[in-house]
């Protein structure tokens, strides 16, 4: 199950630039792929042009922060799958560690959002993506550790 979750994270992260490339091609079969990825991206993200990265002269299917979340999840999935198995820990220890990891990883993103709301100044897309990478990696790590602990 962990392999499925990790594979899904990597595939979705890879689909984002692939969809931008397919949109730039503007051809038949690639068009369906583009519609699917941008459609799903639109269901989970605001897709604001000014808050999105552009690749191949096309806006990515999700904003910079979401791109960071998914890239972080994919990186964590690859890292998690490549490391040796750790010894089992109790569910309560795992839950406590997960809560702390997620709280600490969410701090940069939360600080960025609070800064944006209180000043009206918008951080750069690179800064938005960086905060997403941290939280995305932590979330993926927690999910994969939880899936791994059930085996």
State where each predicted segment sits:
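Hydrophobic alpha-helical transmembrane segments
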Residues: 61-84
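Extracytosolic (periplasmic/ER-lumenal) interhelical loops and adjacent juxtamembrane/interface segments
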Residues: 22-62
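Small-polar-interrupted transmembrane alpha-helices in polytopic inner-membrane proteins
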Residues: 8-16, 92-118
């Amino acid at each position: 199950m962990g392999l499925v979750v990790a594979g899904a994270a990597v595939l979705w992260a890879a689909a984002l630039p692939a969809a931008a490339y397919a949109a730039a091609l503007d051809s038949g079969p690639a068009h369906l792929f583009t519609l699917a990825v941008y459609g799903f991206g639109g269901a989970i993200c605001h897709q604001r042009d000014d808050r999105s990265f552009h690749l191949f002269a096309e806006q990515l299917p999700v904003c910079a922060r979401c791109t960071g979340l998914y890239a972080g999840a994919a990186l964590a999935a690859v890292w998690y799958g490549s490391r040796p198995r750790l010894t089992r820990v109790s569910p309560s220890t795992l839950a406590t560690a997960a809560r702390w990891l997620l709280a600490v990883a969410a701090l940069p993103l939360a600080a960025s959002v609070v800064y944006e709301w209180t000043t009206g100044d918008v951080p750069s897309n690179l800064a938005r993506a960086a905060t997403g990478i941290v939280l995305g990696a932590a979330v993926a790590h927690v999910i994969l550790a939880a899936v791994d602990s059930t085996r």
